[in-house]
């Protein structure tokens, strides 16, 4: 199930280009564009505070939003954003316009559960995450919030592949030519070996020294 949707208010921009974008930022707003669904791109300006908290709140690129552009509501999916390299504030956002049959490629986070039920991890093994996110192709209105990997019963040396993940209907991995690995349970150099019984062999007693006569 996807994140809850939300709404943003925006103003249409008549001017585009670097000069116009700088002017928008000077006025405390963030320039953005809405494109796709066989319609011309629409340049807009968003309130800085609203978009800042959405970007840094998590799940921004996997959550459908509604943008109210001067009273006209447009359903969108955030596709990209740029942050200032020094101050980390948003400087531009791209939105994909969502139509009735829109399908998208989107990176979905991977969550792991039941580490305490993994014999391998209990023995000191380490969960080695190969992919923190997996790219999926799916309907825009059915983007998973995350996918879940259950570690119950996993042992050292085990690999978890995409085929082991139960996916919602209509959600397919973009990589389709192989059963790729998402994580492994690896041994740790600090692992304690299983206890083994050791038998101490007593040193033979020295033969008595013969007394000189």
Swiss-Prot record:
Q: State one molecular function term (GO).
A: structural constituent of ribosome
An annotated GO BP: translation
Name the InterPro entries for this protein. Answer: Rbsml_bL25/Gln-tRNA_synth_N (IPR020056), Ribosomal_bL25/Gln-tRNA_synth (IPR011035), Ribosomal_bL25_b-dom (IPR020057), Ribosomal_bL25_C (IPR037121), Ribosomal_bL25_long (IPR001021), Ribosomal_L25_dom (IPR029751), Ribosomal_uL5_bac-type (IPR020930)
Q: Which UniProt keywords apply?
A: Ribonucleoprotein, Ribosomal protein, RNA-binding, rRNA-binding
- Note whether rRNA-binding occurs among the keywords: yes
GO cellular component term, pick one: cytosolic large ribosomal subunit
Instruction: Give the UniProt family note.
Output: Belongs to the bacterial ribosomal protein bL25 family. CTC subfamily.
Function as written in the Swiss-Prot or TrEMBL entry: This is one of the proteins that binds to the 5S RNA in the ribosome where it forms part of the central protuberance.
What HAMAP family does UniProt report for this protein, alphabetically? Ribosomal_bL25_CTC
Subunit composition and interactions: Part of the 50S ribosomal subunit; part of the 5S rRNA/L5/L18/L25 subcomplex. Contacts the 5S rRNA. Binds to the 5S rRNA independently of L5 and L18.
Protein name as it appears in the record: Large ribosomal subunit protein bL25
């Amino acid at each position: 199930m996807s994140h809850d949707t939300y709404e943003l208010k925006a103003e249409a921009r008549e001017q585009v280009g670097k000069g116009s974008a700088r002017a928008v930022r000077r006025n405390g707003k963030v320039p953005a564009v809405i494109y796709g669904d066989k319609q011309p791109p629409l340049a807009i300006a968003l309130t800085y505070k609203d978009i800042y908290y959405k970007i840094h709140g998590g799940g921004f690129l996997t959550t459908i939003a509604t943008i109210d552009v001067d009273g006209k509501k447009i359903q969108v999916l955030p596709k990209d954003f740029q942050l200032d390299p020094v101050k980390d504030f948003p400087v531009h956002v791209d939105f994909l316009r969502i139509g009735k049959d829109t399908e998208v490629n989107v990176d979905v986070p991977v969550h792991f559960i039941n580490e305490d039920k993994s014999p391998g991890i209990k023995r000191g093994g380490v969960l080695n995450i190969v992919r923190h996110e997996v790219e999926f192709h799916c309907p825009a209105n059915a983007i998973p919030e995350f996918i879940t990997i259950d570690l119950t019963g996993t042992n050292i040396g085990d690999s978890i592949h995409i085929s082991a993940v139960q996916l919602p209907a209509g959600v397919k991995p973009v990589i389709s030519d192989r059963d790729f690995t998402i994580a492994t349970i690896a041994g740790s150099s600090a692992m304690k070996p299983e206890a083994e019984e050791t038998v101490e062999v007593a040193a033979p007693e020295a033969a008595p020294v013969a007394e000189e006569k």
